[in-house]
Amino acid sequence: MCFVLATNLPTMLYSSRKFLGIDRDNFHQDVVCPKCTKLYQIDETVVNNGRQSFARTCDNLPFLRAKRQKTCRAQLAQKIILKNGSVKFYAYKTYCYKSIIDSLETLLKCPGLEEQSEKWKSRKIDNDLYADVYDGQIWKQFGNWKGNKPFLDLPRSFGLMMNVDWFKPFKHWNDFSVGITNMVLMNLPRSIRFRKENVILVGIIPAFKHEPKSLNHFLNPAVDEINALWKAVKVNTHNSPSSTVKIQAAVLCFASDIPAARKLCGFLGHSATRGCSHCY
């Protein structure tokens, strides 16, 4: 009996969660136009004219300054007829997004993380040595241009570092590349700042024939949350489980390779006449 039980037990992490009924898929999914990358809600991809349903086409205007504006008109979903005769529509591309605020709240519920994020305030500082991000002028003076107290000196105020990169998830499929956007808390000591459990996964960009030239559509949900975090939001933490407390955050740094940084920040390409991201 023990042998039969052992053979039926799941052997992978995914199947174990499914076996135990643990749902960790807390991503919000949007349909992506395969041509111009505009995002749509899932329930917006199918249109019904009263007689039949059909896949919607993208109505985005990619070039707003063009004299002759043309809508994208790419089809968003594929029509599939199942064996039982029913019709289903499946999106060609989907974008998975995870709430930054929810991820921050999850991190702050970890024991000791709040205390770790405040350690930088009591560290020894050598004025002649730049040892970490805390020694730079941006970190020291950020937010005090109006004579206020520096933003990061306020309690539960966090500086975020954002990154975007592409990788090949399959070993023998070289032309398939998926992008991810993630963030880390720069308030944390460098020894634990980039640990896997402390990295915030923001979004998963689907594979395209060519990497998108612009990430604006994929960044829109993150920008909305970053604006909310700048004004402060209320969350529960490990030190305050029963009542909510205010937290603030701002993106201070973008850390990517040169091609990804151009797409993330809107800089000119590295082959441009004046392609320096510091000067221009």
Please identify what each model-predicted range represents.
Residues 2-7:
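Amphipathic alpha-helical blocks
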Residues 8-280:
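Domain-level cores of phosphate- or acyl-group-handling catalytic modules
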